[in-house]
Structures are given as C-alpha cells and as structure tokens.
Amino acid sequence: MANSIATYTDSQIMKCLLTHDFDLIGKRFEDNLITKIKTGAFFEATNLDEVVLPAVTHIGSMAFAGTNLTTLTLTWANIVSIGIGAFQDGFGKVPQNLTLPSLTALGAGAFAGASDAKNTELRTISLPIWTGSSISDESISSNTGIFAYCSALTSVSAPELLAIPMSSFQYCTALTELVFPKATSIGSGSFTGCTNLTKIDIGGAVTSMNSSFLSTTTKLEALILLGVTTVPNIGNSTFNDTRIASGQAYVYVPKSLEDTFKVANRWSNYASQIRAIEDYPAICGS
C-alpha cells in the first residue's frame, strides 16, 4: 500500500488484506467499513503514523504491537473485544482516559505496559460490563497480566468484574485504592508490586483469594471484605510478603464473622490482623 492514505469500500477485500501478510508503507490508513482487526494486522508497521477505523468492534491479538502511531481513531464505545497484547507496551496510542462500555472480552497483556511509554500513558480505565471473560489462544489460556506495568494508571472501574485475572494489575504503581464489588475470586499476583496501594475493597461474593495476590504492596493498610457471609478460602501463601503478614495492615470483615475468621483454616495465622468493619467506619466507609 504505497499511497499515503488507503481508503477501501469493499469490506470483504479488507477482511482478506488485514491478516498481516502485506506491507504498510504509507503514513495513514483509513477505512470506514472494517469491523474486525485481525491478529497482527499492523504488527511492526513502523512507518504508519495514523490509523482511522471507526467501525471496528473487535481488535485482534498483537494488532498494534511494534507500531509508532501518533493517532489512532476508533469508536471506543463500540469495542467488544481486545486480543492478546493488542496495545502492549504502549503501542497503538491508547487514550489516557479510556472507557469501554461495550467490552466483554480481554486477552492476556492487552494493555500491559501501556503507561509512561513512547506512544501512550493510560491513566484511567472504565469497564462497565466486563465480567472477566478472556480471549485465549493455544499458548496463552487466560487473560493474565492485562494491565500489568501500567505505571501511570491511577483509576480502575470494573463494577461487574467477577474473576480478577492473575497478575492483572501487577506493578501498577500509581494505584492507591481499588473497589471490586462483585469479585468472586482473586488471581495469583493480581496486585503484586502495587507499591502505593493503601486500600482494596472486595465485595461480599468473594470465595477465594489466591497466592501472593498482594505481595510487595508496601503501603497497604486495609483489605476490606464488605458483605461476605462466609469465610473465603485462602492458601498458605495468600498473604506472603504483605503488611498483613508483618502485622502492619488489617483485614476488615463483618462483625458477625470476626470470630469465625480468626479461627478459620489459615486465617487463624492472621487473627491479630482481623478487625470488624463496623468498628472502623473512617477506614471502611460504613
């Protein structure tokens, strides 16, 4: 595609073209009919400055990996799925404040490292309907590390998120508080290295918390389990390398379950760090 701007009207032709089997040598790529960007479609298209695809709803894995875009125009409100590593390491010029109201599926590392990079600085992300559904391939079977190393990310809104993926916010060092009201499970290493995280509020549906999900959260003060009716399962290493284990942070639970938590399997190791939510309204907001 030697022209500086390529505009196509036959969407069937474009479905064939956008398969990473051609060279993009122009500076601008625009099409108003394409709805799906296939895997690696713009992979390492380093000469490309601008992509305009307003009809796209699905973004394939590694779609913008290795690009140097200065402008990416998508109708973000219509995006339904984003594949593995699509915007990894800041490629693709993602907006600083990103809302994806239609998004239902995310691939591993989709936005990993998309902060303080050459092309983007993702600051806030809102995922109103995402429940944790993933996009997988033969080599990556889950949505691990979706936002890992987004060091400028300060705010996350995912009110419908059920399963917090493994390593999903690892080393997001600008995060200070997080709320996941419907989370049922927390993956290993989900918040590892979030060194400014002081408070995390998990709703009453949580049933399990996996290994080291809060490790090296060096400013953590409170893990709040608001509304739980049973004691969630934890592993031997769930609170490894945390301020909870060192006696500097607390787990806040409903008063009616405080004593149950303190004698529960593995929780009993942290009995001195378990407090009743009702006794600390300034911290727990109740």
Task: Write out the residue ranges for each language-model feature.
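Structural signature of tandem-repeat unit edges
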Residues: M1-K36, T46-H58, T67-S81, G92-A105, ...
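Polar, enzyme-active/binding microenvironments
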Residues: T216, W267, S286
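Short, low-complexity, Pro/Ser/Thr/Gly-rich segments in the mature regions of secreted, periplasmic
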Residues: D279-G285
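Active-site catalytic pocket residues across diverse enzymes, especially alpha/beta-hydrolases
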Residues: G90, A114, N265
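Short, aromatic/basic amphipathic alpha-helical patches
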Residues: N236-D241, D259-S272
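Short intrinsically disordered terminal tails
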Residues: M1, G285-S286
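Consensus positions within tandem repeat domains that build extended binding/scaffold surfaces
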Residues: K38-A41, G60-A63, G83-Q88, G107-A110, ...
